[in-house]
Regions:
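Generic structural signal for residues in well-ordered beta-strands
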Residues: 30, 166-168
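Hydrophobic residues embedded in beta-strands of well-ordered beta-sheets
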Residues: 77, 181-182
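Conserved N-terminal/central alpha/beta ligand/cofactor-binding core
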Residues: 38-42, 46-163
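Beta1/beta-strand and adjacent pyrophosphate-binding region of the FAD-binding site
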Residues: 1-13, 31-33
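Conserved structural-core and active-site-/substrate-pathway-adjacent residues in large, well-folded domains
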Residues: 7-9, 17, 75, 156
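Short beta-strand "acidic-cap" motif of Rossmann-like dinucleotide-binding folds
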Residues: 27-34, 39
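Gly/Ala-rich phosphate-binding loop of Rossmann-like dinucleotide-binding domains
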Residues: 18, 22-23
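A conserved short coil-to-beta-strand element within the FAD-binding core of flavoproteins
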Residues: 144, 168-181
Length: 182
């Protein structure tokens, strides 16, 4: 099959890349290759009784699959340039924050509505820190929680699944040019 765009990985970068490409150019033929399983098939065998620790599965359902390594996290999304990455070094602080807020809006639209956005800016705690020569980093944090984080991923997949070809359990080890494609 030939694709206009082939995305490697269905973690947040791959999911949001596919999402934006679908929105901006719905005629593109998009494929996503993911080493792990679909979200609904991601199951870790550790159960605390018969399997108490990692058994080294060929494909780790905690680290790989739709949603990436954060799929089963507590769903905290930081909106800040003060920590967590250096995107702002490439596109500027305002643009980086605007993009983080845009991702937050998408998360809200796909199941995260009703969750709380916390902030350190302008708080009594921030003032107390300054008075005591402590330097609290400014951040807004959306706390979706584990369950809502999963719902957001389910809803994003439901939106994308008929617009993008997902190929799960398809690790990519190398890329080679074949004719005019790869």
């Amino acid at each position: 099959m030939n694709y206009d765009v082939l995305i490697i990985g269905a973690g947040p970068g791959g999911i949001f890349s596919a999402y934006e490409l679908v929105l901006r150019n719905p005629d593109l033929k998009i494929g996503v290759l993911e080493a792990g399983h679909p979200l609904n098939k991601r199951k870790c065998p550790i159960n605390g009784t018969t399997v108490k620790s990692c058994i080294g599965c060929k494909t780790c359902s905690i680290m790989s699959g739709f949603g990436g390594a954060g799929a089963f996290s507590d769903g905290k999304y930081n909106i800040t340039n003060d920590f967590g990455g250096t995107l702002f070094e490439y596109i500027g602080k305002k643009r980086a924050l605007d993009l983080m807020k845009y991702v937050d809006e998408i998360n809200m639209a796909y199941g995260g509505q009703g969750t709380k956005l916390y902030t350190t800016a302008g708080t009594k705690f921030k003032k107390l820190c300054i008075q005591n020569d402590l330097h609290l980093l400014d951040a807004s944090v959306r706390h979706l929680g584990t369950d809502i984080n999963y719902v957001v991923l389910e809803n994003l997949y439901a939106y994308l699944q008929d617009k993008v070809d997902f190929h799960f359990d398809t690790p990519v080890r190398s890329i080679h040019q074949v004719g005019d494609g790869y």
